[in-house]
Swiss-Prot record:
Species assigned in the record: Dictyostelium discoideum
Name of encoding gene: cmfA
Function in brief: Involved in cell density sensing and might synchronize the onset of development by triggering aggregation when a majority of the cells in a given area have starved.
Signal peptide: 1-18
Protein name per the record: Conditioned medium factor
GO cellular component: extracellular space
UniProt entry tagged with the keyword Transmembrane helix: no
């Protein structure tokens, strides 16, 4: 007797912030390639900077706390030192000059800035810049010294703490424990950049050995990911230096640190020995975010070179795994309900945490040949098969119109099935092989159905599944209860001047660190009070959350799509992540900023998330970017951010990582920066453009 399936189509999923109905997403077979798991090498981080932790010691001769060290300068154009601390920056004094300068220990005068007392060397006077470094509402003061046309070679840097800090118990304890009291970000804008990445996204699980790769390369030879001339799986050619070493400084979720060597021996996933590509392994045993700094040192033309990248690597457990068995049954509308049987390795019960599932679906044509039908995807959770307490399945639904549209029938097959963690979009289990779909019950040939509208018309129900009745009943029934919602970003307060927008309301989830899914859930819950629907004007990560919401869950945004106007408009959103997220994880934790790290904002996290967003949902987004003004000797929104981001940028996200492929790009405004406290006004305070967004919104 055939095993019968309980119809486990997930109608609603209970979340912490209310009950949401996930969409049963589907799309054309021509879109299959858009959902491939990204190659980490394609989103590798590249920079010409390095980050140092400064641990002071007590000088018996001077009766002071100080740090002295040598910093290599390899740029002939510019050299910048930027400092961060949990203590007031005015409590430190900095001296810096080339070792070749005969007057390196002498000083002419003291320049008093907002933060530092800077000793100006007789040799050369730096440009002093004060700023606010960070992401959205999570920031810390920064102080930068920039030398134009510096002497190439080793520089002596001496940092001295003030007498008041010597009496500070917290400072004294950090000195005793050798905990860095200060961070120094060094930028050498030159052709020599570090390039680093994890080798795979498929093993980011506890108990695994995660491989990390790094090299130096020439920026002038770099082909950007956005370039049409970039070959598939391209990576730059390594620069070979002398006296080379590489290491990883790993911050574990429990706060401890490890230093791990990297090797160019061909035995650490680093391809060939002595080819300039270094590899190393991280053994992960804890759940959570790992703060990783990759440090590369060497000598080029007799001068020292040091570069580092900061990564944030989320580690989860492999709590669900595909077994390879797939079953299906038709529902009352002849739609194909597909069930992917799963188990939970090393667990006695199957984990029912909501996940993201994706699969390609194939059928059979009149000649008995396999034919691609469509892809299916959505948020779901493992549910038991009827009559079993141990066999669980994830579900997806394929609208019967997709099958009829390509003239297919049973038997059916699935391929490239992916199950991903909903918080990180780390692949939990995936298979590239083809699996037969076992049909439960008799299959009704949908080609015999008379379809209206005609099959060439792709309906919203085909793409999203059936809208919940309580939403569907409100379509076209206006009661005057619709709103434009203004949303902030990561760890932020209100950023939009509400007086610039008509019929608007401010979303207030202030000073919180949310992943995209949690952020989207809270937005949906807030918007549910507007029974006619709502639209969104979003800043920074608010744009990611808005796109996540309209993609995966039914909400008032779906009611608004029936009306004229824009449903989602965003400003300064890091759709492809920001390299600042990894660096901020290192700096933010060191200086004690309240909001913790957010892996959804990293370039890796964004790449994993973005591959799950279909083209029709991207097309709903109208986005705008900004950048610093140009024409000055030094152009920046935040000078410290320039050391981490591509140029140009808005101080948080660069113009290389703001594009949303398939979205509607509107404009890039100069002389507007991401956040308050930067070199130019905050991008959300552009009143003229705010009023334009208001007039173009649905509500």
């Amino acid at each position: 007797m055939r095993l019968l399936l309980l119809l486990i189509l997930i109608i609603t999923i209970n979340f912490s912030y209310g009950v949401l109905t996930p969409k049963n997403l589907a799309g054309e077979a021509s879109e299959f390639g858009s959902f491939n798991i990204p190659n980490p090498m394609d989103v590798a981080q590249s920079s010409d900077s390095s980050l140092f932790g400064i641990s002071m010691t007590q000088s018996q001769l001077k009766n002071s706390f100080e740090w002295s060290g040598v910093v290599p300068v390899d740029s002939e154009e510019e050299f910048t030192l930027t400092f961060f601390s949990s203590f007031p920056l005015s409590e430190f004094k900095v001296e810096a000059s080339p070792k070749t300068s005969l007057s390196s220990s002498k000083s002419e005068s003291e320049h008093k800035s907002k933060f530092y007392k800077v000793i100006k060397s007789i040799y050369q006077t730096p440009t002093v810049t004060n700023g606010s470094f960070g992401i959205d509402g999570a920031t810390t003061p920064s102080f930068s010294l920039t030398w134009d046309k510096p002497v190439v070679g080793d520089w002596n840097v001496v940092i001295t703490a003030s007498s008041s800090l010597r009496k500070n118990e917290k400072f004294q304890k950090m000195v005793e424990d050798s905990t860095p009291q200060l961070l120094m970000l060094v930028q050498n804008p030159s052709d020599t950049h570090i390039y680093s990445y994890v080798s795979s996204y498929n093993n980011l699980f506890t108990g695994q050995k995660v491989s990390v790769l790094a090299m130096l390369h020439k920026k002038s030879e770099f082909i950007k990911k956005s370039s049409a001339n970039r070959p598939l799986n391209w990576k730059p050619s390594p620069i070979l230096l002398s006296d080379v070493s590489a290491e990883m400084i790993l911050g574990l979720p429990d706060g401890s640190k490890e230093t791990i060597p990297m090797f160019d021996d061909g035995l650490h996933d680093d391809e060939q020995a002595n080819d300039g590509l270094f590899g190393g392994y991280i053994n992960v045993s804890e759940l959570g975010n790992y703060d990783l700094q990759v440090v590369y040192k060497g000598s080029q033309n007799g001068n020292g070179v040091i570069r580092s990248n900061q990564h944030l690597i989320p580690i989860t457990s492999q709590y669900l795994e595909l077994t390879g068995e797939v079953q299906s049954v038709q529902d009352g509308d002849a739609n194909l309900n597909i069930y992917f049987i799963v188990n939970s390795p090393n667990q006695t019960t199957v984990d029912q945490t909501p996940v993201h599932v994706y699969s390609e679906v194939y059928g059979t044509d009149d000649d008995g040949k396999k034919v691609a039908i469509a892809w299916v995807a959505g948020v779901t959770s493992a549910q038991p098969i009827q009559g079993s307490t141990t066999t669980f399945a994830l579900s997806a639904v394929l609208n019967e119109r997709w099958i009829a549209k390509v003239g297919a029938t049973a038997p059916f097959f699935v391929k490239n099935v992916q199950v991903s963690d909903l918080d990180t979009f780390i692949p939990l289990s995936n298979t590239t092989s083809t699996s037969n779909v076992k049909m439960v019950g008799e299959y009704k040939d949908v080609r015999t159905i008379v379809h209206s509208p005609p099959l060439h018309e792709i309906t919203k129900e085909m793409r999203d599944g059936k809208m919940p009745k309580e939403l569907a009943d409100r379509i076209g029934k206006s009661t005057g209860n619709g709103k434009l919602i203004l949303t902030h970003g990561y760890c932020s307060e209100g950023v939009w001047p509400i007086e610039d927008f008509e019929n608007s309301v401010e979303f207030q989830d202030f000073n919180q660190n949310r992943g995209n899914d949690e952020f989207a859930q809270i937005l949906a819950n807030f918007g549910s009070q507007y029974t006619d629907g709502f639209s969104l004007v979003a800043h920074s990560q608010g744009g990611n959350a808005a796109l996540h919401l309209v993609t995966f869950y039914f909400s008032g945004l779906d009611l608004s799509q029936k009306l004229e106007g824009r449903v989602i408009q965003s400003m300064g959103t890091p759709y492809q992540g920001t390299a600042l997220a990894g660096t901020w994880a290192s700096i933010g934790s060191a200086v004690g900023v309240g909001c913790s790290a957010n892996d959804d904002l990293t370039v890796d996290g964004a790449a994993l998330w973005l591959k799950s967003i279909p083209a029709d949902k991207r097309a709903l987004v109208y986005y705008t970017t900004t950048q610093y003004s140009t024409g000055s000797l030094i152009n920046y929104c935040n000078l410290a951010s320039n050391a981490v981001l591509e140029w140009p940028n808005d101080g948080v996200v660069d113009n290389e990582h703001t594009p949303l492929e398939g979205g509607v790009y509107l404009n890039n405004f100069k002389d507007w920066c991401h956040s308050d406290g930067m070199h130019s006004p905050q991008q959300t305070t552009n009143t003229e453009y705010n009023k334009e967004m208001s007039s173009n919104s649905v509500w």
